[in-house]
């Protein structure tokens, strides 16, 4: 879905503010897709923990030197494909079923990293900063916090056994079956958050994780 010119979103509308920063992380803009992440392109950090990004002219600068003019579209939260596969089978009295599901493409904003990597949360989070792990994370939206949204998950798995009933029992019971079901047995994903499926994919905050998880 793209916004037509008739919607008159000239210059774009910033949307979403998470991670205990005042930065918006998505933009609604004419001719662009819903769910675009918007911010600064990450270029790296120095030995002192200072973050660097790319300016609009392609030069590497400290994040403190970047302005809104340097912001670019960093990717989109919507997956290219969402898929699912389910199967059931039986052998004599034993039955087995499972389902797989997943998504291909799209970016996820790890707001947990953004929030707890922000200096404003150090005191409340009781975090220890030492020469080994000390950094000065930026209070800016950057693709440093964007991760792949591709995943595959083994969802529900059920193993059952149907009892063979004699004629006397059938007077009172049509059938009897015992089964065991397990959920969310395995997830294959490069997302470093809790679960790529817990990320918000509705409303206006597409692809943003929840700092509460």
What residue spans do the PLM features occupy?
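Conserved small-residue
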Residues: 1-77, 183-193
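Flexible, surface-exposed loop regions and adjacent strand-edge segments
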Residues: 9-18, 113-122, 191-203
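Membrane-proximal, glycine/serine-rich, low-complexity loop/turn segments characteristic
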Residues: 14, 33, 41, 88, ...
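Extracytoplasmic loops and strand-loop junctions of Gram-negative outer membrane beta-barrel proteins
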Residues: 23-24, 65-73, 78, 126, ...
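Outer-membrane beta-barrel architecture
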Residues: 41, 86-88, 158-162, 181, ...
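Residues that define the transmembrane beta-barrel architecture of outer-membrane proteins
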Residues: 79-83, 150-155, 213
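Transmembrane beta-strands of outer-membrane beta-barrel proteins
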Residues: 85, 91, 96-98, 176-180
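Extracytoplasmic gating/loop element in the C-terminal half of outer-membrane beta-barrel translocons
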Residues: 101-185
């Amino acid at each position: 879905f793209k916004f037509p010119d008739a919607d008159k979103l000239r210059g774009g509308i910033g949307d979403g503010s998470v991670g205990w920063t005042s930065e918006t992380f998505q933009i609604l803009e004419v001719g662009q897709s819903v769910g675009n992440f918007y911010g600064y392109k990450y270029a790296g950090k120095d030995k002192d923990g200072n973050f660097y990004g790319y300016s609009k002219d392609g030069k590497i600068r400290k994040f403190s030197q970047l302005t809104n003019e340097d912001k670019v579209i960093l990717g989109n939260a919507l997956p290219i494909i969402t898929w699912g596969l389910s199967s059931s089978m039986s052998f004599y009295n034993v039955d087995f079923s499972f389902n797989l599901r997943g998504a291909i493409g799209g970016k996820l904003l790890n707001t947990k990293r953004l929030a707890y990597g922000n200096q404003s949360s150090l005191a409340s989070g009781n975090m220890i900063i030492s020469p080994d792990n000390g950094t000065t994370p930026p209070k800016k939206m950057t693709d440093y916090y964007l991760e792949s949204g591709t995943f595959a998950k083994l969802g529900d798995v059920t193993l059952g056994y149907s009892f063979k009933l004699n004629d006397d029992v059938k007077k009172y019971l049509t059938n009897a079956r015992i089964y065991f079901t397990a959920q969310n047995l395995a997830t294959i994903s490069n997302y470093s958050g809790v679960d790529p499926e817990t990320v918000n994919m509705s409303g206006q905050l597409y692809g943003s994780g929840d700092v509460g998880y």
